[in-house]
Design a protein with these regions (language model features):
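Conserved RNA-binding domains used in RNP assembly and mRNA/RNA metabolism
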Residues: 16-109
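Bacterial Sec-dependent N-terminal signal peptides
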Residues: 2-3
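Hydrophobic h-region of N-terminal signal peptides that target proteins for export
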Residues: 6-17
């Protein structure tokens, strides 16, 4: 019975999910994104250093910030190499919690 319920919930979640999209923004951390920049925290000499320091030392999470919204990312490993840089993130957005189920992250031009 539990497996049937789990299968139903998984199907309902997948069918409610939006299709894959590409989002453009900067990889930063949720602490600095909440303050709309690194000026307040400034944990390094660059935005990339600040982002990585906030994640490593302060328990922050990598996010994609598009200038208005900070999207949580399901992948918390790949973003480190793009910290402080403009990227294209492809994935499926969960509208309720603003989390992108990441398929790929590529540098944007």
């Amino acid at each position: 019975m539990k497996s049937l319920l789990f299968a139903f919930l998984a199907f309902a979640t997948l069918s409610a999910a939006s299709p894959k999209r590409t989002f453009v923004g900067v990889i930063t951390d949720d602490m600095c994104a909440a303050k709309a920049g690194h000026a307040t925290m400034r944990m390094g000499s660059t935005d990339a250093e600040c982002t990585i320091a906030c994640v490593d030392a302060h328990g922050a999470q990598y996010v994609l910030y598009d200038g208005k919204t900070a999207y949580s990312l399901s992948d918390q490993r790949t973003p480190q190499q793009f910290a402080g840089r403009k990227v294209k993130v492809t994935g499926t957005l969960n509208e309720k919690n603003k989390t992108i189920l990441v398929t790929s992250i590529l540098a944007a031009k």
